[in-house]
UniProtKB/Swiss-Prot annotation:
Keyword Phosphoprotein: no
Homology family: Belongs to the MinC family.
GO biological process entries: cell morphogenesis; division septum assembly; regulation of cell division; regulation of cell septum assembly
Coiled coil regions, renumbered to chain: none
One Pfam family per UniProt: MinC_C
Role played: Cell division inhibitor that blocks the formation of polar Z ring septums. Rapidly oscillates between the poles of the cell to destabilize FtsZ filaments that have formed before they mature into polar Z rings. Prevents FtsZ polymerization.
Gene source species: Acinetobacter baumannii (strain ACICU)
PANTHER family found in the cross-reference section: SEPTUM SITE-DETERMINING PROTEIN MINC (PTHR34108:SF1)
Classification lineage: Bacteria, Pseudomonadati, Pseudomonadota, Gammaproteobacteria, Moraxellales
Keyword terms of this UniProt record: Cell cycle, Cell division, Septation
InterPro entries: CAP/MinC_C, MinC, MinC_C_sf, MinC_N, Septum_form_inhib_MinC_C
Protein name per its UniProtKB record: Probable septum site-determining protein MinC
Gene (name only): minC
Subunit structure: Interacts with MinD and FtsZ.
Length: 240
């Protein structure tokens, strides 16, 4: 029997991007963010647009209950390598495209069971917009479709190297071969529905699963993906 085993695991992580190297400011702003949710023990990836004292920054994050895992290559790359801290490749730029159409639902606060569909009426201070983006064409390699205020519905599939990101649910009526990210921003109730699952990555509210770890019984099948009570991804095969 082998003494070493490598297994895949779905990990909940967050990416933190710093636009300042003032640790007092970082501590204050992070404290406000951490007080708003249950982030204690969260694994984090560090990105920065400015120079940092990386060791001090890592120590600061640890002291606040976070678990730094790696940095994004770029400004911090050389410093991380010098201390043998993991470095992840920088993001490849994708072409962000516009959806074929959008529908805006205006929900008055306090939330009621009714929502009215609006297209031109401006929002007031007591209203929340939920936007559904519709796209009729296949999402091609290098393209990204993003909706940070609601759901996305793809009426065709998506190619490898493409990406779809929504703060809410994602419905794909075709084959999925790219990256599908629902619940962006932490919406754990978000769900993913697709007609044929061959994704490079699926994620809901930061909990992700790469292609090799997707359960074999749902590959190339209609699938419903959601987070269970333990905040783990569940893959439910659908009968169509």
């Amino acid at each position: 029997m082998a003494d070493i085993r490598i297994t895949g695991r779905m990990v909940n992580f967050s990416r933190i991007t710093f636009d300042t190297n003032d640790h007092d400011v970082i501590r204050q702003q992070l404290s406000n963010i951490l007080n708003e949710g249950s982030y204690q023990g969260t694994v984090v990836i560090i990105d920065s647009t400015v120079e940092q004292e990386l060791i001090a920054l890592i120590q600061l994050l640890v002291s606040m209950g976070l678990q730094p895992m790696a940095v994004i290559d770029g400004i911090l790359g050389d410093e991380a390598r010098a201390i043998q801290f993991p470095v992840l490749p920088a993001d490849q730029p994708l072409q962000r495209i516009k959806p074929t159409a959008e529908q805006v639902a205006i929900v008055e606060k306090p939330s009621s069971a009714q929502a009215s569909v609006e297209t031109k009426k401006p929002l007031n201070n007591n209203a929340v917009a939920h936007i559904t983006s519709y796209h009729d064409e296949i999402l091609r390699t290098g393209q990204s479709l993003v909706q940070d205020q609601g759901d996305i519905i793809l009426k065709a599939g998506m190619n490898s190297g493409s990406e779809v990101i929504a703060s809410g649910n994602i419905h794909i009526y075709g084959t999925v071969r790219g990256r599908v990210i629902a619940g962006a921003g932490g919406h754990a109730a978000a769900r993913i529905f697709c007609q044929s699952l061959e994704a490079e990555l699926v994620s809901i509210a930061g909990t992700y699963c790469v292609a090799d770890d997707i359960p074999k019984h749902v590959v190339k099948k209609p699938v419903h993906i959601y987070l269970n009570e333990k905040q783990e991804l569940e893959f439910e095969a659908l009968e169509l």
